[in-house]
Amino acid sequence: MSWVINPEIVDSKQRARAIARVRELGVVLPTFSQLADPATIPAAVLSRLADVAPDEPRVENLWRVNWYNAADRSGHAEVPGFIVIPESISGVKAPIVVLLGRRFPMIGAHKVLPAYSALAAQLVTGRFDPVTQKAIWPSTGNYCRGGVSISRILGCRGVAVLPAGMSRERFEWLEQWVAHPDDIIRTPGTESNVKEIYDKCAELERDPQNVILNQFSAFSNYLIHYICTGTAAEHAFTAFKGDTNRRLAGFVSATGSAGTIAAGDYLKKRHGTRIAAVEALECPTMLNNGYGEHNIQGIGDKHIPLIHNVMNTDVVIGVSDRVTDQLNLLFGSDAGRNYLRDRRRLDGELVSSFADVGISGFANIVASIKLAKQLHYGPDDVIVTVATDSGSLYDSERDDYRTKHFGGSFDEVNAGEVFGSCLTSIATDNVMELTDQMRRQIFNLGYYTWVEQQGVSVEDFERRRSQSFWDGIADSMPEWDALIEDFNAEASGSNEAASASKARS
């Protein structure tokens, strides 16, 4: 069995049942290119969104699964939402542009994007029957939330599989969205316990009615981030750059499923951008072939995802969860915000904007600072990174950390200490510029997960060493768009549906 899902129909009867279900629900699937460039979405479709709240399980919200939502998450934005981290915070001259995943619909995180691409790819090829089968979403939190929301919109049952130790807010959201309490499956451990998730999925997969949509091995995850997140990062950079001579020097991304980092491949091809992969220092899989527990929720470790283009990665950076937990407290507490405004003289609007940054976003920001220092980037060297979700998902984590490490009271003196130790004093330790030999070592580490444990053939595993393999995935987007258009056309013969499915730039 090949682990790459090609853009071709494999089961016409099952596809026909999927078409009947989306016809019944009045669904028109956005093409991948439309999500990359929402300017190509028909005006009639966009106008209907005005009456739909972004967090409702409505079919219209499929069209909001893109980077171009306004700050209120309802309207359309001409440029993806981003904030710029200035030298007064980072201590480096290189501007750091942070894309904001909070603006995505339903889950307030950009992981709904690969969830959509995964299920859409299954539906249009006839690999999934939304009437009789369940969509199983293995995740450390945000991807399974995205999967459950997309499943609900598309009329099928979604099951979340995630570690029991994830934030309370994740589980509270899931409890409101799943069809049945049994559709939340808690596995042992926390963020880095991905193996336990795989084991549960292997058990569930024995039932043919359960279809595993594994983000760590779904190349639709790579493809959608390559085109959508890559395009959004480029657009945000261009908007920030203006008519200056700045260059897109670096792209920084934590490697949870290694989907987001695919945007780096897009940017490297077009701008020569250096790609930096981020992991928790407490679980230094790439840095040291290490292992351990950590609390940078949103990135899973102790293995190399199948969809990580390791041979195109330039730098690996380790960030401690002590730093990210403390930054979550600094920017998310009244005392911290008061310190930043009053003592550091930071703009109040800038300080408030950090509400849009979650724990993994802080990891990416700190890693960007490390990258800028390591590579001696200057004011014309722009680094782009991503805040997957917002601080609102980590209120409970913030409270727990305050109680455990600050005795329940966090004041402006504490805030000053955190600012100094976690931002201005950030060093270039645990930064590894990769040689070809180092890339091969990291690549080979994936063998033990994917070949020995998950049954990927050696041939399929090895194909991923070549950049031509990844270029082939990226170049398949027009074929996927065509499959989606054909699926839509069969689901509805109306002129409106036809124009919605075929509009593109």
PLM regions and their residue ranges:
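PLP-dependent amino-acid enzyme catalytic core
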Residues: 1-505
